[in-house]
């Protein structure tokens, strides 16, 4: 509370239950932060007894350490670094690369070990290249939006989860192989939405720069062996956009 009263610091206010970047607002400390919290409680009809979580804003790249545990036993682990995100304020990544970071991985495993975790989880971190410092952000206890990257890099979490459940954790662990490093995956439709968001913010040149210098090894939603995924996803977003007049709408129940 003492640090949050410092008006020179920047903070992130996050609803306790949100959807990607929805339910997240940025603010200076002190009176500005208090006003932001009051505004979130009113706008999202939150319970004042469960106000948004306040975290100090941290600069740096977004990383994720994804794991499968079985009653406290680690079965598989995979690390990726975010290169682009759907909207400027954060949220789902549209471009990311398989990578490794020993410090983050050790911290993630230490936390899940202590919790005797069971099931899937992705732990998010921020890493500041200038200082080498990394900071833990949150745990997502579910399958994650960038699951295609782990599959493309050789870590099939759904299959390993199935094996752990049907044949036991030892069998699942025997099928795990460390990920190939440097594999890049792009969410094609999400990248289009990202460009629309940039254009909406007046960054037209960036929005229209299609050659970003990154070669994708895989696309989340464009597969030769399953081509209807892209069409189905496109139809879903088009219908939602026509209904809500937004490509990233806030719908009932998303933030609470």
Question: Over which residues does each language-model region extend?
Answer:
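Glycine-rich phosphate/pyrophosphate-binding beta-alpha loops
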Residues: 18-21, 83-88, 92-95, 140-155
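Conserved metal-phosphate-binding beta-hairpin within the catalytic cores
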Residues: 113-148
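Peripheral (often C-terminal) accessory segments that flank ATP-dependent C-N-forming ligase machineries
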Residues: 163-256
């Amino acid at each position: 509370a003492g640090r949050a009263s410092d008006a020179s610091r920047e903070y992130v206010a996050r609803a306790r239950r949100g959807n990607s970047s929805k339910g997240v607002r940025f603010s200076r400390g002190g009176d500005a932060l208090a006003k932001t919290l009051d505004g979130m409680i009113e706008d999202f009809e939150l319970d004042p007894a469960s106000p948004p979580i306040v975290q100090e804003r941290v600069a740096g790249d977004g990383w994720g350490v994804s794991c499968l545990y079985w009653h406290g036993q680690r079965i598989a682990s995979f690390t990726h670094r975010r290169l682009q995100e759907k909207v400027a304020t954060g949220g789902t990544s549209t471009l990311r690369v398989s990578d490794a970071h020993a410090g983050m991985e050790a911290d993630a495993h230490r936390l899940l070990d202590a919790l005797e975790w069971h099931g899937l989880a992705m732990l998010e971190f921020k890493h500041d290249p200038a200082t080498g410092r990394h900071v833990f952000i949150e745990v997502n206890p579910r399958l994650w939006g960038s699951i295609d990257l782990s599959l493309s890099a050789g870590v099939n979490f759904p299959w390993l989860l199935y094996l752990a459940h049907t044949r036991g954790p030892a069998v699942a662990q025997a099928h795990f192989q460390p990920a190939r490093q440097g594999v890049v995956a792009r969410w094609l439709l999400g990248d289009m939405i990202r460009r629309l968001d940039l254009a909406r913010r007046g960054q037209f040149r960036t929005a229209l720069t299609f050659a970003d210098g990154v070669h994708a090894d895989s696309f989340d939603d464009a597969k030769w062996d399953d081509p209807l995924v892209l069409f189905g996803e496109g139809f879903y977003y088009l219908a939602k956009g026509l209904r809500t007049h937004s490509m990233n709408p806030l719908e009932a129940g998303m933030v609470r």
